[in-house]
């Protein structure tokens, strides 16, 4: 089922879900008409040749890392979530592999 922002707010699949969009200095988060923008929990760290370093300024290409969301999901049985890229993340050199948040 595809639902709009109002219906998504009624289902409340995210703990402490915001009912509006908050625009930050670089990215935004919260509810919009087309979905919910989540936030990355931690600083992004890339590991290269056994040495970890924080990305600052120039973004390296072709490296992978894992990140967590600040938001905590509790999907109802009739709703599935899909995580897509955000253009503001892409402008910072981050690309997200699309993933599914399973129902239930």
Where are the model-predicted features located?
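Non-catalytic terminal segments and appended small domains
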Residues: 1-104
